[in-house]
Structures are given as structure tokens and as C-alpha cells.
A protein has these predicted regions:
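Conserved class I S-adenosyl-L-methionine
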Residues: 1-44, 58-62, 81-84, 88, ...
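Class I SAM-dependent methyltransferase SAM/SAH-binding core
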Residues: 48-104
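A short acidic, Gly/Pro-enriched loop at the edge of an enzyme's catalytic core
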Residues: 103-115
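A short SAM/SAH-binding and catalytic strip from SAM-dependent methyltransferases
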Residues: 114-126
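A short glycine-rich, Lys/Arg-flanked "PGG" loop and its adjoining helix->strand segment in the class I
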Residues: 128-140
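Conserved beta-strand signature within the Rossmann-like core of class I S-adenosyl-L-methionine
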Residues: 142-148
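Short, glycine-/aromatic-enriched active-site segment of Class I SAM-dependent methyltransferases
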Residues: 149-167
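Short alpha-helix
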Residues: 168-184
Length: 229
């Protein structure tokens, strides 16, 4: 499948997610692993931040509070997700939402001081190209932060690839780090962010076999990779 076809498939799939209300529900699932990352980013009040794969915009609300003198741009390939984000957070004066894919970010070079992506990067059709684009729009000294739950070193998430309707990239921490370095990032490092939120006694969803499987997955932690331009 070509990159344009991959992007179209992603757009259609995440439009369906948006219409089902799944965009708004992502905050509950992702907040416990995202808050520690925001602390690690050491945001300044005047930072300009790009969120790649913003969904329905929940992270923009948190970011806008932390950078009151800066700008927050949420980008998503799903036009329906962006429509909902604009509706949900119309009152955020320093925030805007744009439709776009990471392979061709609709923004000028050297603008952002930080870029973040939460649970989006493994959907990118070409991670290397996406990271090069993020590097392009970052200022010198800016940093990129990619947070994912689906990665090769956590065996308890591998089943997701068969459950998702779109192509995914299951890479290891070392492979992601090499992608960062190949794109031109320096000071590349990675770590695990453990989800310490309570787990249910009984699990009836489709992503894990049972509650014990979910707990094992959470104990491995999400993978955070970051680097500097």
C-alpha cells in the first residue's frame, strides 16, 4: 500500500473512531502515562508546542495551561477528530487544530520548541520521514517526545496488530532510537513510563486476554523516546 493510501486508510479509520466518541475517551486511558512526560519536558511559559496525532484535543487543554505565553498546535490526520477538537476547545485562545499527517506537516520550519506525540507514532506510515518532518519544524535546541504503548519490548501488546484495522509498526526501543538518530536528532534517549492507575478486577475488553494480562502490560510501562534538534 502506498503512503497516500496508508494515510487515507488512517483518516477513514480514525474518522470512524471520532464518530464513535473514542477520541474523547482517550484522556482516561492515556493521562496516567502522559502527565509524567509533561513534567520531564520542563515546559516554559512561552514554548510553542506541536502535538502530532492530537485526536479530540484533550492534551491541548493541558498544554495550553502550561504555556500561557506560547502557542499549542494540535494536528491529526482525521478531519473528524480535528472538527471535534475545535468544537471541544474553542475557548483555548493560544491553541489551534490543523488537519495533517506527520509525513508532511503543514507548518513552516523552525517554529516549535517542543513536539509531542502520544500513542500515535506506531501508526505513522513512514516513521523515519515523520521524524525528519518533526525535526524540520523544530527550532534549534527544540526537542521531540514520542510516547507509545505498542512496542516490541513489551510482549503483552503484540496482539494489538491483529486487532487494529490499519497497518502498524512494531519497533523496539533501540529501533525507535535509531530512527531518531537517523533523522538527525541528538541526545536521543528512552525510558519506560509505568501506568500506576488502578486496574479492574475483571477485564472484558478486546485488547487483553484478561485482567492479569492487562496488569502485566501496565507493569512493563509505556515507551518514551526523546531527542534534541
Amino acid at each position: 500500500m502506498s503512503e497516500s493510501n496508508n494515510n487515507q486508510a488512517l483518516r477513514e479509520e480514525f474518522n470512524r473512531w471520532a464518530e464513535a466518541g473514542r477520541g474523547e475517551g482517550m484522556e482516561e486511558d492515556h493521562l496516567p502515562i502522559t502527565l509524567p512526560v509533561l513534567d520531564l519536558m520542563q515546559l516554559a511559559p512561552d514554548d510553542n508546542i506541536l502535538d502530532v496525532g492530537c485526536g479530540a484535543g484533550w492534551l491541548e487543554r493541558l498544554l495550553s495551561e502550561r504555556v500561557p505565553e506560547g502557542r499549542v498546535v494540535g494536528m491529526d490526520i482525521s478531519d473528524e477528530m480535528v472538527r471535534r477538537a475545535r468544537r471541544n476547545y474553542v475557548a483555548l485562545e493560544n491553541t489551534m487544530f490543523v488537519i495533517g499527517g506527520v509525513d508532511e506537516i503543514p507548518w513552516d520550519a523552525n517554529f516549535f520548541t517542543r513536539a509531542i506525540s502520544v500513542e500515535s507514532a506506531y501508526y505513522w506510515p513512514d516513521p523515519a520521514r515523520g521524524l525528519r518532518e518533526i525535526l524540520r519544524v523544530l527550532r534549534e535546541g527544540g526537542s521531540a517526545w514520542v510516547l507509545i504503548n505498542y512496542y516490541r519490548d513489551n510482549p503483552h501488546c503484540h496482539q494489538w496488530g491483529d486487532l487494529l484495522a490499519v497497518k502498524t509498526n512494531l519497533l523496539s526501543a533501540e529501533e525507535w532510537s535509531e530512527q531518531f538518530r537517523a533523522a538527525g536528532f541528538t541526545n536521543v534517549a528512552y525510558e519506560r513510563i509505568v501506568d500506576s492507575s488502578p486496574s479492574p478486577d475483571v477485564y472484558t475488553g478486546r485488547w487483553f486476554h484478561d485482567a492479569a494480562h492487562l496488569r502485566a502490560f501496565k507493569s512493563e510501562g509505556a515507551l518514551l523516546i526523546h531527542g534534541t534538534k
